[in-house]
């Protein structure tokens, strides 16, 4: 069975400033585009059997820039719905909720179009996505690539390893990086994390 490759989109103005960016559709910065372009040799070193991408423009542009042009858009790859914390930094949230932590405390309710998600709800989406990944891996001898978002991919990694969604907190994930999840003796493992070309 092939590897599961995770690509976090390149930098945006909001990711650079630490603002929670769930459903707000912000573009990549020029630095974010360069981060993505520099991943091309790493992507080309793998045989790609299937690819999926979040609907957001930052993820779709990253997919295009890394040379993955036939990725299937899948809403299960959307970033965590931050509800009332959309666009707010952790520092600002903690001014009113000291000790607040996304992976255990969740988010404040938001408007009807993005009401917010609990860690468990994000975990359920990750499980659905992993079922699609496993079906794709069974149908090809290549790797499957997911181009998506930091917090969601951290939860997905935890679920791949059999951990609760809150354990996504253990996996710091930088913009414009590649991660590789594989298997050892039939069990899921992290084979590479936050991989970047040396010149970045």
Positions of the model-derived regions?
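Acidic, low-complexity terminal tails and accessory targeting/binding regions
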Residues: 1-2, 81-92, 135, 139-142, ...
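Short, hydrophobic/glycine-enriched beta-strand segments
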Residues: 3-9, 146
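Loop-to-helix element that buttresses phosphate recognition and phosphoryl-transfer chemistry
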Residues: 8-62, 112-127
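Short active-site segment of divalent metal-dependent hydrolases/proteases
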Residues: 12, 152-153
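Short hydrophobic/aromatic-enriched beta-strand-loop microsegments
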Residues: 27, 69-76, 164-172
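Phosphate-coordination/substrate-recognition cap region in phosphate-metabolizing enzymes
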Residues: 38-101
């Amino acid at each position: 069975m092939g590897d599961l490759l995770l690509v976090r989109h390149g930098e945006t103005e909001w990711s650079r400033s630490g603002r929670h960016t769930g459903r707000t559709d912000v573009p990549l910065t020029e630095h974010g585009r360069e981060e993505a372009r520099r991943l091309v040799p790493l992507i080309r070193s793998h045989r790609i059997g299937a690819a999926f991408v979040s609907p957001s423009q930052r993820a779709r542009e990253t997919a295009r820039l890394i040379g993955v042009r036939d990725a299937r858009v899948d809403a299960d790859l959307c970033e965590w719905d931050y509800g009332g914390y959309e666009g707010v930094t952790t520092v600002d949230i903690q001014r009113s909720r000291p000790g607040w932590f996304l992976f255990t405390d969740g988010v404040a309710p938001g408007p009807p179009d993005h009401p917010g998600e609990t860690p468990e709800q994000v975990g359920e989406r990750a499980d659905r996505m992993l079922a699609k990944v496993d079906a794709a891996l069974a149908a090809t001898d290549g790797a499957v690539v997911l181009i998506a978002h930091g917090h969601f991919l951290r939860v997905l990694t935890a679920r791949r390893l059999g951990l609760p969604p809150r354990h996504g907190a253990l996996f710091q994930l930088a913009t414009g990086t590649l991660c590789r999840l594989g298997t050892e003796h039939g069990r899921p493992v992290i084979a590479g994390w936050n991989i970047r070309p040396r010149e970045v």
